[in-house]
């Protein structure tokens, strides 16, 4: 008879110690593998509290972390599911945040900044070669392996990371951290690997002067700055920065993602690969002083958010391999990871694609209609007299014989749209459709129908797989 015993491998093999960080559904604790004495950081997720979508995200994070093996990336050593909990066993990184270490140094130069960004670029390049986009590159996720001098920079927190095919650009949702978001994400355009390079540009700018290129307490104004690429190199602090460093920043902060420098190209830039002869060795005390203020502002706003989170269930709050004070920040700062806005943006996306589909119908554009619909589209509609219709032939008849031949103006609006998101790649929308048209006598008329549409995303594109319409037929009968 098959054993139904619950897995207790983590409990059997590891000993837990103090807490290192905390999120809404997870806690990070130091642990030790009993057989070897080797220390790790265990991210312990309470799976009883996770939604189906959160489960998918956890599986994605574990899958991505298992794939990435690089000296500049926090390594996942084990992933164990037990009753009610999932354990992700990572490298124990004890050096804290890179930015906190820099301000404690007695000497810090452009050459040091070059060495830091080189390690970050190595980690990003490894991600991109493996089809992974991090999406949340920022100081909080740049850690040091140990307190030793010259310890490696480690990229952490793959909670928002996504898997992409080659140079695929698609809309993967609104996610990231405000001050580090790329113009294409803010425009809600398809995006891919270049978003990480934009964030690298923001990080490099801060590494050189201690403050960010884009900053405003008002998030809308901040986003306008980013979309316009409105940054500069003000005097006097930038006067002592070499032209090569500024050139690399300009190549990273290029608005057009197709023209933005890639990680592999950036690693070949003279300021990186010829550091000893190109980057300045002058100590940058002003940068260290500014960076102290920048860090203090991040920590203060983090403390405010922690207080806010204590009073509500906030699933986006998460902590991975952070120092106890490495907390997230309030939404008006530029350092808060945002993914809840992703839900709002995705719902808006479903409304937009539904409007595009209706526009194709109004225009009698069967080609545009077929691009938005799944070839096996199923439907219940008044024209089919209660029968389930499958495929496109039934609809083709109306496009060829009624819709395309109607040259009278038709105007449609969607009222009270309600969108239900079903996981990452499916959604359902219900709405009332009002269609205005001119009848045969030149009189304005209005038709109303109630519609529900089911959408499925394949290869980054939404397709209508089913709809149910009651009320008036689509085509004005006496038009």
Swiss-Prot record:
It holds the Pfam family CaMKII_AD. One of its GO terms (cellular component) is neuron projection. Belongs to the protein kinase superfamily. CAMK Ser/Thr protein kinase family. CaMK subfamily. GO terms for molecular function: ATP binding; calcium/calmodulin-dependent protein kinase activity; calmodulin binding; protein serine kinase activity. This is Calcium/calmodulin-dependent protein kinase type II delta chain. Its EC number is 2.7.11.17. Keywords: ATP-binding, Calmodulin-binding, Kinase, Nucleotide-binding, Phosphoprotein, Serine/threonine-protein kinase, Transferase. Autophosphorylation of CAMK2 plays an important role in the regulation of the kinase activity. ATP binds at residues 20-28, 43. CAMK2 is composed of four different chains: alpha, beta, gamma, and delta. The different isoforms assemble into homo- or heteromultimeric holoenzymes composed of 8 to 12 subunits. The active site is at residue 136. Gene3D superfamilies: 3.10.450.50, 6.10.140.620, Phosphorylase Kinase, domain 1, Transferase(Phosphotransferase) domain 1. CDD domains: STKc_CaMKII (cd14086). CaM-kinase II (CAMK2) is a prominent kinase in the central nervous system. The modification Phosphoserine is found at residues 315, 319. One of its GO terms (biological process) is regulation of protein localization to plasma membrane. The modification Phosphothreonine is found at residues 287, 337. The keyword Kinase applies. It catalyses: L-seryl-[protein] + ATP = O-phospho-L-seryl-[protein] + ADP + H(+); L-threonyl-[protein] + ATP = O-phospho-L-threonyl-[protein] + ADP + H(+). It comes from the Eukaryota. Residues 14-272 form the Protein kinase domain.
